[in-house]
A protein has these predicted regions:
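Active-site-proximal cap/lid insertion segments
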Residues: 32-191, 195-205, 257-258, 262-298, ...
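Short alpha-helical segments and helix-capping/turn motifs at coil-helix boundaries
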Residues: 21-30, 128, 151-153, 232-235
């Protein structure tokens, strides 16, 4: 497969050098070899939280996508041009009860919906390009967002407003078109499902399970799990378990308020308005919940009758059995995944990088075995990448993943590098028999 990413890399660690054939604003399936299978990701940042207070132009807004590699400082052509609203002033907006119903909040929500309309057009662009390339009916298209909404009390929290996301799968030739699927799905299911869709068996080390494809799991999820720890410059620890109807949350730092003063989020007009109204005593009881000085140790919500998760049932005797069930499931899950949340960050860093020195991946070792080059690395978990210097003349092409011995040829020059995620990459090792 030819694998591309355009272009966000918010991985919390440096990616492996073999992660992508290309990851840039130019990355596209159109750069692959003819008839090569492809896997392409496009991240439309227009609906990102920051676009509520600073709606800016991106490379997707250029007349040609992907742009030519000589585009230069493309953003300069948008200097001084304000983003318009793509929705009318009369748009009907339903404000959730945890936010004030006033013009400031309504204007942020209007911009949010405008950004969604704009994003929808970008999705249409990609679908049109697939159609133009006669690939639309040969390609599985998966659409989803990376977390819940961008407004206060949404992103960063484990309420459904922060973790529930839309997802659409389009199969070729209208297969299962219009079907609605209410299964519980977790993001840890994405990797095994992707492999399953490509007829590749998922690995045993995957925490998730395939929900589509050849290796689709026979067992549906009974629960999904969620975790929240560091929020930019602030730290907390919350865990959650949800079944189809009920959500359990465990707050490991109940002495901390839910609201944390994140400098980045407070650029938002709605956030500034919430702070102002809290200080002046203008918030109602539901809106004040987020500003409590302490959190309950446990929370339980019926998401059917209380979709905004505002009525905590953890202390209600009628729900003690459900509370016990989900509480035990939370503990069981944390044990199964060896949850590192309770470990202080300094100790966690020390366990990864002793003395805070980043480990270095061992250099790859090249052996000529018969008519093949066999390459290995002593660093457990490292990926090995290679470039055929005598063939790969395009400088932007990424490192190919080494997965099998390379046939020996006269006049060949091959570069190898090894990299384990979290480590520094190895030095480049070159095999050459060229004159």
């Amino acid at each position: 497969y030819y694998c591309t990413n355009n272009k966000k890399e918010d991985y919390q660690f440096y990616k492996s050098l073999t992660a992508w054939d290309e990851s840039s604003i130019f990355a596209h399936w159109r750069n692959r070899d003819k008839d090569q299978n492809f896997y392409s990701i496009f991240n439309f940042g227009v609906t990102h939280e920051s676009n509520l207070w600073d709606p800016w132009y991106r490379h997707f807004d250029l007349d040609t996508f992907p742009p030519g590699r000589g585009i230069g400082k493309w953003w300069e052509q948008f200097a001084g041009i304000e983003k318009p609203f793509y929705v009318s002033d009369s748009i009907k907006i339903s404000i959730p009860p945890y936010l004030p119903n006033n013009d400031i909040v309504r204007n942020d929500m209007k911009r949010m919906y405008s950004n969604i309309v704009e994003m929808d057009g970008k999705v249409g662009l990609i679908l049109k390009q697939l159609e133009d390339d006669n690939l639309l009916e040969e390609t599985i298209v998966v659409f989803y967002t990376d977390h819940g909404g961008p407004l206060p009390r949404e992103k960063r929290l484990l309420y459904d407003s922060g973790i529930r996301v839309p997802m659409i799968i389009r199969y070729p030739n209208q297969v299962r078109a219009g079907e609605v699927d209410n299964r519980l799905i977790s993001f840890v299911d994405f990797a095994p499902t992707l492999l399953s869709m490509a007829n590749i068996p998922p690995h045993k080390f995957h925490q998730g399970r395939a929900f589509e494809g050849k290796y689709k799991s026979k067992n549906k999820r009974k629960y999904i799990y969620a975790a929240a720890d560091r929020f930019d410059e602030h730290y907390d620890m919350i865990r959650a378990v949800r079944d189809n109807q009920y959500k359990y949350l465990k707050n490991f730092n109940p002495e901390k308020p839910y609201y944390l003063p994140l400098e980045y989020r407070e650029k938002m007009d709605s956030m500034q308005e919430l702070i102002r109204m809290n200080q002046s005593g203008q918030l109602d009881n539901l809106q004040l919940q987020w500003f409590r000085n302490e959190k309950p140790k446990e929370e339980l919500f019926d998401t059917y009758s209380d979709p905004y998760e505002l009525r905590n049932l953890a202390g209600d005797p009628k729900y003690k059995d459900k509370l016990y069930e989900l509480k035990n499931e939370c503990s069981k899950w944390m044990d199964e995944v060896d949850d590192k949340g309770p470990m202080p960050e300094e100790e966690l860093i020390e366990s990864f990088w002793p003395n805070k020195i980043q480990p270095i991946t061992k250099d790859p070792v090249i052996d000529k075995v018969g008519d093949n080059l066999v390459v290995s690395c002593q660093t457990e978990g490292a990926n090995i990448g290679f470039k055929l210097s005598h063939q790969d003349t395009l400088t932007w092409k990424g490192w190919r993943p080494y997965i099998k011995p390379i046939a020996y040829e006269e006049g060949m020059k091959v570069e190898f590098k090894a990299h384990r995620i979290g480590y520094l990459p190895s030095k480049k090792v070159v095999f050459s028999n060229a004159n």
